[in-house]
Amino acid sequence: MAIWQGASRRLSTGAKVWRAAKKHKREMGRPAAETQVSDKIKRKIVRCRGANLKVKLEKTNYANVFDQANKVCKKVVVTNVIDNKANKHYIRRNVMTKGAIIETEMGKAKVTSRPGQDGVVNAILLTE
């Protein structure tokens, strides 16, 4: 069954709301990509509104980490997810979202991109 992002058919009181118009394709949604740390890199290309393409990153073990002190950006290996404010269960499953703290070869880094929307993991190195 499709994910529908339209208004609910019920009011807060429980009364049924009758539709003024039918459901439209523009109101459909998709499940989240939930990018995981894995040895294999897996991307999914999805057609979105306006016949545009969106690259969803499903699995990866690399991130582009920017070192602010040296002004250098490097492609490094991600080992695991240390903290994720989006969902506490994402830490155990190694799911990367924007704002997640990841462990890399260079040290701890904070994800600044949206991997499920952008198709790449960009991060900033944290100073300890």
From Swiss-Prot:
Q: Which GO terms describe its cellular component?
A: ribonucleoprotein complex; ribosome
Gene Ontology biological process terms, A to Z: translation
User: GO molecular function: any one?
Assistant: structural constituent of ribosome
Q: Report the superkingdom from the record.
A: Archaea
Report keywords, A-Z: Ribonucleoprotein, Ribosomal protein
Against CDD domains, the record matches this protein to:
Ribosomal_S8e (cd11382)
Q: How does it assemble?
A: Part of the 30S ribosomal subunit.
Q: Does the keyword Ribosomal protein apply?
A: yes
Task: List the residue ranges forming a coiled coil, or say none.
Answer: none
**What InterPro entries is this protein classified in?**
Ribosomal_eS8, Ribosomal_eS8_CS, Ribosomal_protein_eS8_arc, Ribosomal_Se8/biogenesis_NSA2
Q: What is this protein called?
A: Small ribosomal subunit protein eS8
Is the keyword Coiled coil assigned to this protein? no
Give the family, as the similarity comment puts it. Belongs to the eukaryotic ribosomal protein eS8 family.
